[in-house]
UniProtKB/Swiss-Prot annotation:
Family designation: Belongs to the universal ribosomal protein uS11 family.
Keywords for the protein's UniProt record, in alphabetical order: Ribonucleoprotein, Ribosomal protein, RNA-binding, rRNA-binding
Pfam families xref list: Ribosomal_S11
Annotated organism of origin: Buchnera aphidicola subsp. Acyrthosiphon pisum (strain APS) (Acyrthosiphon pisum symbiotic bacterium)
SS bond list: none
InterPro entries, per database record: Ribosomal_uS11 (IPR001971), Ribosomal_uS11_bac-type (IPR019981), Ribosomal_uS11_CS (IPR018102), Ribosomal_uS11_sf (IPR036967)
Official protein name in the record: Small ribosomal subunit protein uS11
PROSITE patterns named among the record's database cross-references: RIBOSOMAL_S11
Quaternary assembly: Part of the 30S ribosomal subunit. Interacts with proteins S7 and S18. Binds to IF-3.
Residue ranges of coiled coil: none
Length: 131
């Protein structure tokens, strides 16, 4: 006997209007991750240099970070964000170009904070490369 299956309706997520957001930029030596959240820290959208089509050593370029920031801005523009607070973490090459790309995407940057973790003589750093 075959049961009649009822169609399951999935509700479309309602995009709420958010005026202020926080852009978290994690710029490592190998990649750049851009995440835009609301004030409470709920992620609205994210993009990476690697996910933007750059592989290998091209992931760690300022241009790849710029493209990732543009993609992230495109994802979250439906939320109506006008102002962004920027939190930059890490020593990577995409720090400055990401902020410039977010500014060019139409966001008003209100605050830039460096939240790079600095050890108080914690773990031993990796040894120097010999090429």
């Amino acid at each position: 006997m075959v049961k009649n299956s009822t169609s399951i309706r999935t509700r479309k997520r309602v995009k709420k209007q958010i005026l202020d957001g926080i852009a978290h930029i994690h710029a490592s030596f190998n990649n750049t991750i851009v995440t835009i959240t609301d004030r409470q820290g709920n992620a609205l959208g994210w993009a990476t240099s690697g996910g933007s089509g750059f592989r290998g050593s091209r992931k760690s370029t300022p241009f790849a970070a710029q493209v990732a920031a543009e993609r992230c801005a495109e994802i979250v523009k439906d939320y109506g964000i006008k102002n962004l607070e920027v939190m930059v973490k890490g020593p990577g090459p995409g720090r400055e170009s990401t902020i410039r790309a977010l500014n060019a995407a139409g966001f008003r940057i209100t605050n830039i904070t460096d939240v790079t973790p600095i050890p108080h003589n914690g773990c031993r750093p990796p040894k120097k490369r010999r090429v």
